């Protein structure tokens, strides 16, 4: 073991936290809990600057420490105040450890970073000896030995891992000496050299043996190279000392060249000797440039109402001639007679997919000049229907009059190659053939526009790998593809190839990589990324290889967050946003290494039975996504193929789940390690057409995975009307914005607006309202006076409807972001303001929500638009009601709440086209109007009330996710003992108060909607934590079933279904944004008495007060809490969406006065929110004048509280327990309003030790609440 020298650098101060996020800093300070606790972290807004964070009265105060031109450091001060400058950070902190230095409080208690076991563990699980990059010959040799170490018997493992041991010794000790030497000006690394020489002693002899053998073989084919080998061997025998390592590298380089060229030389020599021409094997699958005519056998779907058709032959064949631009509809008659009609591409008006019947398709034909007809056909399978749609879209695109495409197809492939070169035929991977959701044989003939290949453990050099891919594409598509980007990090590679015709449409190509390997310094794990613009649409692609090992979930999560933050791709002006918000479409794929948390034998049994649902429920990636730990709002197609890892090499029949390591036998359960996820801006078009794996490529222990996507793109818009005059200028105007951010800070905030449609980013003024109902959250608001009117560079609606606006909420004290989001302008266009509501995120974590009212004003001269190709296909919810089974994903990632005004109704055309009967005809005017408008809603602007039934809200109720741990008496979440023992479904069978004027027209909610909405595995085609309202959100409950209650102090998150079912009372649904959905401002109401909650015995863990329903059920104390794969309980690991939480902070139901008077009573079942016992936060809100109609926020009543007529002292005196007054007041319980939330632990902290006295006090409080 190498000894650590005396020159080791001193450890950093306890208060110094490099690379710590603002949110994590606030959590550390909250856990410390003492005034004067402090730490210093890197600034998120200024490179090279720091942020001093101080806790005082439960609020975190942040001070920026900025370097000046001379690299002196100073705390940023108010204008006119002379800053105090210091050479080093410790000197600066030393000053502020003294009292009265201008900070909010003296720095007293440095806070250390909590170091977990995984933080200290620098090994990489299974990969103790990572394969080295393939660029030099030495790395090839290392890769070979690495392969030996996994497959050789245990007695050879120690020798094989010699380099690993020496490397670890160097990283733990001697590298610090080299670092010190470099700081002192050294140009070499003696300790590293020594480490490498000792590691490579045996390699010298092995290389010499191989070279001697190759010398003999070389003499047969090439005398020149043989003599060079001889000279090299003689030279190497005389070398030693400092030059030894250099000559070893030279030998290895020659060995590499010799090995790669000897086969070619031998082949040439043998060909010269042979007089016959070698036979060339035919290509496996040559694709003609001309796509052949494809024929589909279908049946006509006859409506029962059309009795004249019943009994007649309804068999048809549909022939698609892509090259000729026509569709032949042939009806099969008796006696071999046929009747056909030919429709050119311009006569096919629309395709309408049925959601309820997956193999049904409606086709609307233009029959005559101004008439249309619809026919519904039943295909042999859903796959055949999709192939037909793809061919027709290709035909439309090919014969379109547009110069630029509206839609492209993208192939994404990911494969861990296992350090073995790929087999030559890669057809099944390229053609998306194999297991899972695959393309129909008729559709695989269609070449994709862009191919993106991500590989891991790829030992092939870049040039050779790109050539292999190009040749494979040429072989199977008969088209030339151009490589536009290749990025490599060790053995992690990404290659992007595009059709030659698209080469000039691609610009702004960017590439980047991030290392997350051992100690985050080695590139054996990490990510490579590529970004570019395709005309006006931005794309990002990330290929990653994350930490292996079944138990390394936290480290994989951290790998993802590091990549998200450090990968430098996309527009540099968007550096305030992580890469998940920088691109119209972001694809993230690779060997993510998330495993299955289940016994190996159970896993194998489920795989043998092809039952994947139980496995997907214990898939670590799905579980972590459900908890919002990673891939926030990303989507993944449904998995319907077996786990892709770990197979026996050479076949796909057997999983090899044991692996010999230096530390012993390791179990690798079969898992879906290789995945493809994506995230797109709201109101954009993207459809996943295939997602599966191959079953015939067997060189690696992983199977290659493929996914194909249909993606809408925009052109580089050029206005036909030229630049707008001042009278024709479009405007983006905000009426108001309100945000709830997760922070213990109480600074002021402003908003920055970014968009490609703006010349430069714009800033708002600071917020003019600010309040807090919870110490860990802040509600901030901006009125129209504080918000800037934005002027787009182009005013045409055709341009603006494809644009998006990025918002970031930043603090005035540190100019650091507290949350970012993206809004689509498409739904905001109109003469009246539209409302938006979406989530905020920062560094991959959900940090709150934001809502507001805005409009995009477009001058009438610029209103002309056209139908996009992808709008040509719509989705029909069918005449039977809602969709059944799995449905297509919603097109939006945020909710648009449409007011019930004439402005919204104008967007609904005439009757739905999907309702037109088979022979129904209508005028072309009506048809054109409807076609466009229906598609706008189906594809672009999904109603909260019409969204997919499978799109659910996460209701994970983990207080640790949305409160800062360690803050006493502040939690507002379910106690662990009322969490159900399975995944937590959201509220079911909810009811809401109807809007004014709708009494008697309401319909009861669907009783079966809850089952359709909740999926623990997140397997529907949607972002797992999507916050779009589901169908039953739009259902309006009966008038009498509405619960009328005043706004609580702190409304709790939604209760899980199990908690509701255990209650004796029947609760209605708390309507989400009822005031917004109804388009009305609720009438102001006076505060009403709100009964307190009955806390469960013992309160909530961590000193918090749990909330529950009155008359709580008796729960078994022995019931085990819900647990996930790492053994963490639900309270520790189940995460509540911050958006769900923030909604409850900002939403209340306001009943009308008559309803309130009729239904309120002291015995009515009600929920009460929590108030806080100590240091109540004063509201700083500035009154805002609201318009009488159309305003976003209603006049809110003040927080309700326990109605009291006496002080705490008087109350205690009545009970004869006045001696407890001093203890209660000392602990902040100075008002009966707060005492309603006190628990037994709180009473003990206040000095109430006697159990009988505690019982008297709690019973008295309960009685007063009633």
Curated annotation (Swiss-Prot):
Q: Which GO terms describe its molecular function?
A: actin binding; inositol-polyphosphate 5-phosphatase activity; phosphatidylinositol-3,4,5-trisphosphate 5-phosphatase activity
Topology of this chain in the membrane = Peripheral membrane protein
Instruction: List the catalytic activities from the record.
Output: a 1,2-diacyl-sn-glycero-3-phospho-(1D-myo-inositol-3,4,5-trisphosphate) + H2O = a 1,2-diacyl-sn-glycero-3-phospho-(1D-myo-inositol-3,4-bisphosphate) + phosphate
Where does the SH2 domain start and stop, copy by copy?
15-111
CDD domains documented for this protein: INPP5c_SHIP2-INPPL1, SAM_Ship2
Using the record's annotations, give every residue carrying the modification Phosphotyrosine: 961
Q: What is this protein called?
A: Phosphatidylinositol 3,4,5-trisphosphate 5-phosphatase 2A
């Amino acid at each position: 073991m190498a000894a650590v020298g005396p020159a080791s650098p001193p450890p950093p101060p306890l208060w110094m936290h490099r690379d710590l996020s603002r949110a994590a800093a606030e959590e550390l300070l909250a856990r410390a809990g003492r005034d004067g606790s402090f730490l210093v972290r890197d600034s998120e807004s200024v490179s090279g600057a720091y942020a001093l964070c101080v806790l005082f009265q439960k609020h975190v105060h942040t001070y920026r420490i900025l370097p000046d031109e001379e690299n002196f450091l100073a705390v940023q001060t108010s204008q006119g105040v002379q800053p105090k400058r210091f050479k080093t950070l410790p000197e600066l902190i030393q000053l502020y450890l003294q009292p009265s230095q201008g900070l909010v409080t003296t720095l007293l208690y440095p806070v250390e970073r909590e170091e977990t076991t995984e933080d200290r563990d620098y090994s990489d699980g299974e990969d103790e000896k990572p394969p080295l990059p393939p660029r030099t010959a030495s790395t090839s040799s290392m890769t070979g030995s690495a392969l030996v170490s996994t497959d050789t018997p245990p007695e050879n493992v120690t020798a094989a891992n010699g380099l690993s041991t020496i490397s670890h010794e160097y990283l733990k000790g001697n590298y610090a000496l080299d670092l010190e030497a470099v700081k002192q000006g050294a140009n070499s690394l003696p300790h590293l050299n020594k480490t490498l020489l000792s590691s490579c002693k045996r390699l010298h002899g092995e290389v010499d043996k191989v070279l001697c053998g190759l010398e003999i073989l070389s003499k047969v084919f090439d005398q020149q190279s043989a003599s060079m080998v001889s000279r090299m061997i003689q030279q190497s025998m005389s070398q030693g000392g400092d030059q030894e390592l250099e000559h070893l590298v030279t030998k290895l380089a020659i060995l590499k060249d010799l090995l790669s060229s000897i086969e070619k030389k031998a082949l040439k020599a043998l060909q010269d000797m042979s007089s016959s021409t070698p036979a060339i094997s035919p290509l496996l699958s040559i694709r003609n440039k001309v796509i052949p005519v494809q024929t589909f056998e279908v049946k006509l779907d006859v409506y029962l109402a059309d009795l004249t058709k019943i009994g007649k032959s309804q068999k048809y064949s549909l022939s698609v001639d892509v090259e000729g631009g026509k569709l032949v509809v042939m009806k099969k008659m008796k006696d071999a007679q046929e009747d056909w009609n030919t429709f050119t591409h311009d006569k096919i008006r629309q395709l309408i997919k049925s959601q309820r019947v997956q193999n049904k398709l409606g086709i609307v034909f233009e029959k005559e000049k101004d008439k249309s007809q619809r026919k519904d056909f039943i295909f042999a399978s859903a796959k055949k229907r999709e192939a037909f749609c793809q061919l027709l879209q290709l035909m439309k695109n090919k014969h379109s009059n547009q110069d630029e495409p509206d839609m492209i197809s993208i192939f994404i492939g990911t494969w861990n190659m296992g350090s073995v070169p790929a087999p030559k035929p890669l057809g099944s991977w390229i053609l998306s053939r194999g297991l899972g959701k695959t393309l129909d044989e008729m559709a695989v003939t269609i070449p994709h526009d862009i191919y993106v290949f991500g590989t891991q453990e790829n030992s092939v050099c870049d040039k050779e790998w790109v050539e292999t891919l190009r040749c494979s594409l040429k072989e199977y598509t008969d088209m030339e593809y151009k490589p536009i980007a290749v990025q490599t990090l060790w053995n992690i590679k990404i290659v992007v190839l595009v059709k030659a015709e698209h080469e000039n449409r691609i610009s702004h190509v960017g590439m980047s990589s991030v290392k997350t390997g051992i100690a985050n310094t080695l590139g054996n794990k990490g990510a490579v990324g590529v970004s570019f613009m395709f005309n006006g649409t931005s794309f990002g692609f990330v290929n990653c290889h994350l930490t292996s090992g079944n138990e390394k979930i936290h480290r994989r999560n951290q790998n993802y967050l590091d990549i998200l933050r450090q990968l430098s791709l996309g527009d540099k002006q968007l550096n305030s946003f992580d890469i998940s918000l920088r691109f119209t479409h972001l694809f993230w794929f690779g060997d993510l290494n998330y495993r299955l948390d289940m016994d190996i034998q159970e896993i194998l049994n489920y795989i043998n039975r092809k039952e994947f649902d139980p496995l997907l429920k214990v898939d670590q990636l799905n579980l972590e996504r459900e908890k919002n730990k990673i891939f926030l709002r990303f989507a993944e197609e449904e998995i319907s193929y077996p786990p892709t890892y770990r197979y026996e090499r050479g076949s796909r029949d057997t999983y090899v789940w044991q692996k010999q390591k230096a530390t012993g036998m390791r179990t690798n359960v079969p898992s879906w390690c290789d995945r493809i996820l994506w995230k797109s801006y709201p109101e954009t078009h993207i459809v996943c057409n295939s997602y599966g794996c191959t079953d015939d490529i067997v060189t690696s222990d992983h199977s290659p995975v493929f996914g194909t996507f249909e993606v809408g793109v925009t052109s580089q818009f050029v206005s036909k009307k030229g630049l707008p005059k001042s009278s024709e200028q479009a405007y983006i105007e905000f009426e108001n914005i309100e945000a709830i951010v997760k922070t213990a800070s109480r600074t002021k905030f402003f908003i920055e607006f970014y968009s490609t449609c703006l010349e430069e980013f714009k800033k708002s003024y600071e917020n003019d309202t600010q309040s807090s109902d919870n110490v860990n959250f802040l509600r901030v608001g901006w009125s129209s006076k504080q918000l800037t009117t934005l002027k787009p560079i182009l005013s045409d609606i055709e341009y603006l409807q494809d644009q998006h606006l990025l918002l970031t909420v930043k603090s005035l004290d540190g100019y650091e972001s507290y949350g970012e989001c993206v809004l689509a302008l498409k739904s905001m266009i109109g003469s009246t303001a539209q409302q938006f509501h979406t989530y905020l995120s920062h560094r991959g974590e959900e940090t709150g929500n934001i809502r507001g009212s805005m409009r995009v004003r477009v001058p009438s001269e610029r209103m002309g638009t056209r139908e996009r190709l992808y709008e040509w296909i719509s989705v029909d919810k069918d005449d039977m009601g809602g969709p059944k089974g799995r449905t297509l994903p919603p097109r939006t990632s945020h909710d648009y709440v449409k007011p019930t005004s004439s402005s919204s109704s104008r967007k609904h055309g005439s009757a739905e086209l999907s309702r037109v009967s088979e022979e129904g005809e209508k005028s072309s005017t009506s048809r054109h109007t409807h076609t466009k408008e229906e598609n706008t809603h189906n594809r672009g602007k999904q109603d909260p009330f019409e969204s997919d039934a499978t799109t659910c809200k996460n209701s994970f109720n983990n207080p640790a996710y949305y409160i800062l741990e360690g803050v006493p008496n502040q939690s507002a979440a379910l106690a662990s003992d009322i969490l159900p023992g399975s995944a937590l479904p959201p509220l079911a069978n909810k009811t809401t108060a109807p809007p004014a004027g709708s009494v008697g027209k309401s319909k009861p909610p669907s009783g079966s909607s809850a089952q359709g909405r909740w999926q623990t595995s997140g397997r529907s085609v949607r972002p797992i934590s999507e916050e779009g309202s589901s169908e039953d959100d739009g259902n309006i409950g009966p008038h009498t079933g509405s619960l009328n209650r005043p706004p609580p102090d702190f409304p709790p998150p939604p209760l899980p279904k199990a908690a509701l079912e255990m209650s004796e009372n029947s609760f209605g649904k708390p309507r989400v944004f009822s005031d917004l959905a109804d388009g009305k401002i609720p009438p102001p109401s006076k505060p009403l008495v709100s009964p307190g909650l009955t806390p469960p015995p013992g309160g909530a863990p961590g000193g918090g007060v749990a909330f529950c329903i009155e008359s709580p059920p008796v729960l078994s104390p022995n019931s085990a809490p819900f647990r996930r794969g790492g053994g963490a309980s639900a309270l520790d690991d189940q995460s509540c969406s911050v958006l769900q939480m923030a909604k409850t902070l900002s939403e209340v139901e306001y009943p009308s006065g008559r309803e309130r008077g009729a239904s309120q009573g002291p015995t009515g079942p009600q929920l009460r929110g929590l108030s806080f016992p100590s240091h109540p936060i004063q509201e700083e809100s500035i009154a805002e004048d609201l318009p009488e109609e159309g305003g976003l926020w209603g006049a809110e009543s003040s927080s309700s509280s326990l109605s009291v007529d006496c002080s705490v002292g008087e109350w205690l005196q009545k009970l004869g327990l006045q001696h407890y007054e001093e203890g209660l007041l000392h602990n902040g319980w100075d008002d009966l309003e707060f005492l309603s939330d006190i628990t037994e632990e709180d009473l003990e902290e206040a000095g109430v030790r006697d159990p009988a006295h505690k019982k008297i006090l709690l019973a008295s409080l309960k009685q007063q609440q009633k």
